[in-house]
């Protein structure tokens, strides 16, 4: 007798079920897709023990006739396709005819279904693959699928299931993802005796996203919509750069209404966010991509969660450019990090001050005196002797004596703007600024001020328009790394390296990109050699064009060594190797878009040319840096995405000190 034998039907069904039914969430996904394909507008899901004991899904879809109900549990029986060619143009979520027979093989399955034109419903019951006679019963139009005792006949698989809580969470994740894709469908999830999730089903995407992700994120969402010449459509919402996560769990792609995992598309979105997010953080988005069905392959993965495109690179470029354009056109407001957002202690809230009117008047007098003294140089920590005047002496005396009482510390924001030229006048008196800051000051970039948006609910909780930074008064340095500045009722902490990095990046972008968008290069008098690993060398040789876009001209020098003959204009001397490795690392991570590479090159140049942490800055240099920040278009991070601003509100300080 031969070694190879034909397996019996029961074993074949068990193997097939293992490919489709991995856990309760797999069943929920398959059954929900069937309900959506049936045109349901309301779907109710009930779970017991996370789906291990019971999964019940009730929909108001089209239902099935008695003959179809009996046939639907046969393997590879489906209404979605008729021949192999249909696989390349399938527009439904399900099409293989594997889900129901696979579920029936490892559970106790009951299907009750009725069409609206039928007088009675049909009930199909199967226990572990064993069929029972078909029954005629009474039921409303639609379909109810009940799955009990999952893996009751395969205890070896049942023991690998996780806790009821973990399995229930996985089921809920499947439900809210489909709810986000189908805002016109009302989903409800009941676990135990409580409804844990419900979507409105009113075809309003923002209300659906609010139900799924929480109302607090809505103000950070940016609507996105674009149509490519090929007819591709991209729509949905992306998070502003201030809304980011420590993993990719909140990245949701729906291609032709199907939730998928797509590395190439997610990478395209992340490339668009390059330089806007801190390291190790990922953007939030819910995006819908509509393509002709024949241009994608949805049958390339056992669970249909991964797809293939016939023009993958073009789709990725379309996605990246659309997201980048949306980010660039967002309102120029700066959501700032607040001290309150980092705390979780139980200190009592500060009571409302009883002397607000008096303090406002006193504080405003103190504030105006401080501005005038700063303009005259009296508050600058320099040893230069300044000419005295009776008026200025009186103001200094009032400030130092504390005659204004609490108003000195509790002055309120005035409706009058701080003159934007006061810092500039102080800068003109001092010639000891750092060269890089002075060069950026000479550009005379225009100030920008963004008017508040009409829809209050769409604004960030904390906002700062670009021109407001010009009103800040530098106080000093902390640990030679952070600039302390005051403005209005707020104390600001500025990371000097990250802030200067952003300033230099802005200047480099305008100064060193030629008309073709390529970083201008300068030949090195003495070329620099750099030795690479075999993998790095191979990657560098395959990316010669991208390196040239970044301003680097290299050639092979033997073995795994390259010769750097030219670098971008403005790169500080001695930074050639480090800059080259920065760009090569970006290329090795898969960044191939030329615009992204150019941005990475400018980011590296700005980082290497910026003032470093631990470096002493004069009062004039701090003021110069704040003035340059005021000229930026509402950006609150360094080019690598790290925030450079932290605010401490006056009331937060009062709460910390238990002021009443």
UniProtKB/Swiss-Prot annotation:
Keywords: DNA damage, DNA repair. Coiled coil: none annotated. Residues 341-355 have a biased composition (Polar residues). SUPFAM superfamilies: ATPase domain of HSP90 chaperone/DNA topoisomerase II/histidine kinase, DNA mismatch repair protein MutL, Ribosomal protein S5 domain 2-like. InterPro entries: DNA_mismatch_repair_CS, DNA_mismatch_repair_MutL, DNA_mismatch_S5_2-like, HATPase_C_sf, MutL/Mlh/PMS, MutL/Mlh/Pms-like, MutL_C, MutL_C_dimsub. The keyword Kinase does not apply. GO terms for cellular component: mismatch repair complex. Residues 385-398 have a biased composition (Basic and acidic residues). Residues 341-362, 378-398 are annotated as: Disordered. SMART domains: DNA_mis_repair, MutL_C. GO terms for molecular function: ATP binding; ATP hydrolysis activity; ATP-dependent DNA damage sensor activity; mismatched DNA binding. GO terms for biological process: mismatch repair. It comes from the Bacteria. PROSITE patterns: DNA_MISMATCH_REPAIR_1. The keyword Aminoacyl-tRNA synthetase does not apply. Belongs to the DNA mismatch repair MutL/HexB family. This protein is involved in the repair of mismatches in DNA. It is required for dam-dependent methyl-directed DNA mismatch repair. May act as a 'molecular matchmaker', a protein that promotes the formation of a stable complex between two or more DNA-binding proteins in an ATP-dependent manner without itself being part of a final effector complex. PANTHER family: DNA MISMATCH REPAIR PROTEIN MLH, PMS, MUTL (PTHR10073), DNA MISMATCH REPAIR PROTEIN MLH1 (PTHR10073:SF12). This is DNA mismatch repair protein MutL.
């Amino acid at each position: 007798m031969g070694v190879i034998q034909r397996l019996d039907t029961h074993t074949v069904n068990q193997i097939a079920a293992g490919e489709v039914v991995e856990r309760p969430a797999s069943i929920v996904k398959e059954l929900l897709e069937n309900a959506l394909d049936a045109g349901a507008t309301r779907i109710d899901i009930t779970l017991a023990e996370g789906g291990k004991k019971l999964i019940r899904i009730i929909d108001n879809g089209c239902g099935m006739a008695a003959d179809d109900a009996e046939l639907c549990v046969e393997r590879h029986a489906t209404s979605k396709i008729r021949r192999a060619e249909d696989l390349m143009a399938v527009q439904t979520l399900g099409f293989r005819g594997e889900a129901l027979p696979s579920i029936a093989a490892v559970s106790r399955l009951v299907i009750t279904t009725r069409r609206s034109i039928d007088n009675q419903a049909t009930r199909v019951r199967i226990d572990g693959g064993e069929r029972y006679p078909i029954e005629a019963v009474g039921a409303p139009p639609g379909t109810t699928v009940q799955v009990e005792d999952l893996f009751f006949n395969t205890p070896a698989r049942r023991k690998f299931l996780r806790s009821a809580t973990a399995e229930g969470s996985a089921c809920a994740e499947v439900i809210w993802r489909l709810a986000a894709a189908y805002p016109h469908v009302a989903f409800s999830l009941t676990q135990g005796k409580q409804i844990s999730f419900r979507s409105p089903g009113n075809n309003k995407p923002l209300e659906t996203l609010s139900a799924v992700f929480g109302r607090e994120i809505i103000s950070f969402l940016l609507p996105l919509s674009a149509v490519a010449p090929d007819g591709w459509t991209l729509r949905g919402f992306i998070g502003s750069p201030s809304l980011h996560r420590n993993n990719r769990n909140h990245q949701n792609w729906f291609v032709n209404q199907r939730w998928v995992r797509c590395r190439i598309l997610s990478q395209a979105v992340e490339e668009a966010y390059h330089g806007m997010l801190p390291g190790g953080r990922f953007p939030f988005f819910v995006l819908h991509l509509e393509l002709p069905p024949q241009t994608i392959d949805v049958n390339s993965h056992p669970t249909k969660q991964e797809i293939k495109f016939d023009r993958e690179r073009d789709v990725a470029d379309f996605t990246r450019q659309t997201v980048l354009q949306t980010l660039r056109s967002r309102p120029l407001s700066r959501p700032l990090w607040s001290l309150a957002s980092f705390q979780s202690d139980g200190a009592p809230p500060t009571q409302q001050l009883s002397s607000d009117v008096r303090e406002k008047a006193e504080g405003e007098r103190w504030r105006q005196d401080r501005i005038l003294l700063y303009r005259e140089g009296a508050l600058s920590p320099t040893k230069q002797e300044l000419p005295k005047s009776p008026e200025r002496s009186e103001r200094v005396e009032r400030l130092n004596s504390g005659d204004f009482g609490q108003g000195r510390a509790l002055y309120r924001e005035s409706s009058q703007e701080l003159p934007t030229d006061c810092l500039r006048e102080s800068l003109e008196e001092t010639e000891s600024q750092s060269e890089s800051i002075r060069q950026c000051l000479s550009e005379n970039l225009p100030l920008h001020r963004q008017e508040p948006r009409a829809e209050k609910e769409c604004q960030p909780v904390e906002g700062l328009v670009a021109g407001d930074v010009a009103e800040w008064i530098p106080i000093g340095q902390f640990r030679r790394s952070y600039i302390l500045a005051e403005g209005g009722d707020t104390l600001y902490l500025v990371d000097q390296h990250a802030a200067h990095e952003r300033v230099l990046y802005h200047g480099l972008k305008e100064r060193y990109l030629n008309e073709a968008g390529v970083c201008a290069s300068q030949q090195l008098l003495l070329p620099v050699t750099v030795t690479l690993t075999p993998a790095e060398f191979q990657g560098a040789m395959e990316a010669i064009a991208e390196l040239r876009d970044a301003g680097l001209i290299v050639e092979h020098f033997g073995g795994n060594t390259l010769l750097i003959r030219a670098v971008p204009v403005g790169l500080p001397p001695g930074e050639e190797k480090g800059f080259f490795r920065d760009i090569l690392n970006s290329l090795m991570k898969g960044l191939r878009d030329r615009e992204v590479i150019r941005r990475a090159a400018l980011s590296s140049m700005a980082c290497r040319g910026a003032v470093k942490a631990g470096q002493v800055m004069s009062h004039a240099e701090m003021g110069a840096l704040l003035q340059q920040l005021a000229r930026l278009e509402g950006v609150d991070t360094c080019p690598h995405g790290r925030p450079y601003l932290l605010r401490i509100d006056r009331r937060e300080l009062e709460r910390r000190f238990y002021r009443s």
